[in-house]
Amino acid sequence: SEWFKSVNRVKQQLPDSVTTVELFKYAAPLVTKLGDGHTMLRFPFNDYFTSSTIRLPLFLNVKSDYTLRVRGCIDNLIPQDAEVLSINGKESRELIESMMDYASGERDFFRIERINSDFSALFEMMYAADKYDVVYRMKDSKKKLEVTLHPTTWAELLPRMPKKKEQARVPDYSFKVDEKKKVAVMDFRSFNNPQRMKMFADSMFVTLREKGIKNLIIDLRNNGGGNSMVGDVLFRYISPKPFKQMGKALVRVTPTTIRLTGRTQMVPGWSFYNDESKGNFIPPLTKEEGHYEGSVYLLISHHTFSSAGSFAWAFKEFGMGTVIGEESGGMNVSFGDIIYYKLPVSGLS
């Protein structure tokens, strides 16, 4: 296949000895070619960024329209939210497109989300220089401005960055009620801890019933996934019918899978599971048990991924309410759970 041809080409290009960053540069594009957001090679941040590493003193947000917006700059030389047009002659679109080889995902807009997280590291790996000539323009302006930035260490950079307000840690899930508008908004950030979700959901829906709140907005726009069982807990309160997030699965177990997971009871081979029979569906709660009888709206974005993506498609499939927003980051036919492991020599994970 074309993928194995790519593997062979990389093998031929590899020198006898490489650093972890160099190995990442060779190997990550091969992993990206698989086209799956759950299958990725992580950048070796700790190996690359040390106390003596000098870096571009500019932090950027990567947007889905292939533009770059300033998040922060040394001495505030480029104001926040200004648009960076080019760095050392490389236009923003060219920079982003060149990094796509290192961003795993099914859809380009989700891969850009990945680049947004790793932009500083990928930029240093690919475009490190002695100085950086930056062309930018202010928000809502067409006038091009220029500034030259010089790389600095983190210790020098940090005290010279614009001060930000300290932000409190955002909980995995929270809610607030607007009693005048009779609406509640659940801020759902992570699919974590099914037992805690049960306690949270009980409390939230009791509050909504007591206050007569008939409209619930579930905000899933900043949710990258987690444990799908958390979604099942919440679904029991809002689904009008029995539901299931996953219908069928094709499972392959290899000796490598067994070694990496430590699940020695697994048997190598292929298995097919069909859970679409009605007996395997999860029943919603009854009204007496606390089922929510109001209208539910689900907000999603390109960042809605993994367990959050499966939550979104099950929400729509079983008629739980109205979905509003952008296409989610994952696909409803996808790889299943993930296995974390480190390569034995390089330590890349």
Where are these predicted regions, by residue range?
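Conserved acidic, small-residue-rich alpha-beta core segments centered on
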Residues: 82, 228-349
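Flexible, low-complexity junctional segments that flank or bridge functional domains
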Residues: 1-216, 220-250, 332, 336-343
